[in-house]
Curated annotation (Swiss-Prot):
This is Uncharacterized protein MG360. InterPro entries: DNA/RNA_pol_sf, DNA_pol_Y-fam_lit_finger_sf, DNA_pol_Y-fam_little_finger, DNA_polymerase-Y, DNApol_IV, PolY_HhH_motif, Rev_trsase/Diguanyl_cyclase, UmuC. PROSITE patterns: UMUC. One of its GO terms (molecular function) is damaged DNA binding. It comes from Mycoplasma genitalium (strain ATCC 33530 / DSM 19775 / NCTC 10195 / G37) (Mycoplasmoides genitalium).
Amino acid sequence: MINTFTYFEPEYLIDKNLIFLYFDFDAFFASVEELENPELVNQPLIVGNRFSRSVVSTCNYVARSYGIRSGMSILKALELCPNAIFAHSNFRNYRKHSKRIFSVIESTFSLKIDVLSVDEGVACFQNISFKKAFLIAKKIKNFVFQNLRIKISIGISDHFLIAKIFSNQAKPFGIKSCSVKDIKKKLWPLPITEIPGIGEKHIDLVFKNNFYKINDLAVCEDASLLKKVFGNFWESLKAVSLGKWYTDNNNQVKSRSFAVSETLEDLNYSNNQLNKKLTQIFDQLFIRLQLSSQVCKGIVVQLKSNDFIVNSHSNKMKKYSNDYRKLLSITKRLFNRLLINTEKNVRLIGISFFDLKKIDTDEGQKKSLFYQFIPKSISKLSEESSLDKLIFDINESFGFEIIKRANKLKS
């Protein structure tokens, strides 16, 4: 019997009748390209570089009808649809549209959205019925499409992660709801891969042990088997299948991780070039950590060689941190340890932060002119972390790099 972990309701959920609306923009990057180039509508559109060894960033639903999916290699996508049209990624433009959409929703419907990524966000309502939540979701969905020409799918639940799962079930351009009391009927029949955190990397092991539906995870009471199949996060996955939350001994909700990876176009990078690329990827991930107002306790670095063999190293710190130099130093140490044992050329570099925790607002933060660039959500940052975030915000506001650290200047 399972008796090694505890279910609980997080402090912010206790004695509160909350319902979450989880917003997920449909094929967002492709939708923005279609919005700005109407001639691309109804054409098989792939966002990515046609002549690179990278992967499909996203694609529209016409391209998906050919079997093309996000994360698929460009070569495979071209095999499936030789006449596909390609658009280069323009992340600054996608962020601009994302900010506008979320801002319009907030101002029009007088609600606060917690923006989770460029194309995902969640709003929380207290003391309303599922029927009322559905009507609100329908109004938002239709308003955004009619006024901004972007399609969104919305999941509704009294459990945050179940709302996320059902936003995916609602695609494209739909609304799906599932209350915790209805999980046996609505959640359990779904494929187990619908639970966030169960990816393709371990799916063979999952299927081999007869976990196909969420129901299979929910009813399993063999803790040793669950740990073998799902690893260190099995308690959290199990809790989601039961519509509950999981806490460790420190009474903290186990958080999702942040990850960024990049497929290299040149397979002949020197170690010095690879370390520079690592720093660029790290900077992207660090910015996400800062914007989410969280600290992390663990880092994973992953390398994929040109023969598609994947290796990784991880480090779990004693204390939570958002210190730029400390996290970068650990990341580089893990990376170079991997390089020593990698005989083939490097094809992909990935970094993830895990075991995340929210940080409180620092009311004593300096209020100088430069600190106005720092979003109010950023809190209790170390001086080093604040400086790096400040540099990013200033450069972002001007549209190009006008400020950089002295140690990054060429001699």
